Amino acid sequence: MFVPKKSKYKKVFKGRIKGNAKGGSTLSFGDYGLKAMEVGKVQSKHIETARRVISRTLKRSGKVWIRIFPDTPVSKKPADVRMGKGKGSIEFWVFKAKPGRVLFEISSDVPMHLARLALEKATAKLPMKCKFISNHN
C-alpha cells in the first residue's frame, strides 16, 4: 500500500478542499489519462485497486503511471470510546484530489479503445467522478 516513509507532522487537521488543481492537470508521461472532475479524498486502497483493474484490463501491456500519492493521514478513535482524551491514531492515508487533477496515465502503445475501457473501469473504483482524456484530440 502507499504510505509515506516519513511525515513532517504525525497528525493533521481535517481541512477543506477548495478550488481547482494548480498543477498536475495535464498529461506528462503517457497519451491517455484519467482526470478528476470533482473533489475527493482518494485512499491508498482506492489507488491500489484502480491500478490493479487497469493492469488487468490492459493484460500487462503498456505502461501505467500513478500521478498521485496519499500524503495526508486520517485519524480515527476506536469504537465505544468516550469523547476527549486526545486525537485518535492514524487509520489510513489519503490524497486530497481537486477538480482537474490527472490521477493515472497510460502509454501510447495501447489502443485507444482499450485505454478508455481500462480507465473507465478504474473510475468505478474511485470515490469521485473522473473523465478520460487523451493527447489525440
UniProtKB/Swiss-Prot annotation:
<protein>
    <recommendedName>
        <fullName>Large ribosomal subunit protein uL16</fullName>
    </recommendedName>
</protein>
<keyword id="KW-0699">rRNA-binding</keyword>
<dbReference type="InterPro" id="IPR047873">
    <property type="entry name" value="Ribosomal_uL16"/>
</dbReference>
<dbReference type="GO" id="GO:0000049">
    <property type="term" value="F:tRNA binding"/>
</dbReference>
<comment type="function">
    <text>Binds 23S rRNA and is also seen to make contacts with the A and possibly P site tRNAs.</text>
</comment>
<dbReference type="GO" id="GO:0003735">
    <property type="term" value="F:structural constituent of ribosome"/>
</dbReference>
<comment type="subunit">
    <text>Part of the 50S ribosomal subunit.</text>
</comment>
<dbReference type="InterPro" id="IPR020798">
    <property type="entry name" value="Ribosomal_uL16_CS"/>
</dbReference>
<keyword id="KW-0689">Ribosomal protein</keyword>
<dbReference type="InterPro" id="IPR000114">
    <property type="entry name" value="Ribosomal_uL16_bact-type"/>
</dbReference>
<keyword id="KW-0694">RNA-binding</keyword>
<dbReference type="GO" id="GO:0019843">
    <property type="term" value="F:rRNA binding"/>
</dbReference>
<dbReference type="InterPro" id="IPR036920">
    <property type="entry name" value="Ribosomal_uL16_sf"/>
</dbReference>
<keyword id="KW-0820">tRNA-binding</keyword>
<dbReference type="GO" id="GO:0006412">
    <property type="term" value="P:translation"/>
</dbReference>
<comment type="similarity">
    <text>Belongs to the universal ribosomal protein uL16 family.</text>
</comment>
<dbReference type="InterPro" id="IPR016180">
    <property type="entry name" value="Ribosomal_uL16_dom"/>
</dbReference>
<dbReference type="Pfam" id="PF00252">
    <property type="entry name" value="Ribosomal_L16"/>
</dbReference>
<dbReference type="GO" id="GO:0022625">
    <property type="term" value="C:cytosolic large ribosomal subunit"/>
</dbReference>
<keyword id="KW-0687">Ribonucleoprotein</keyword>
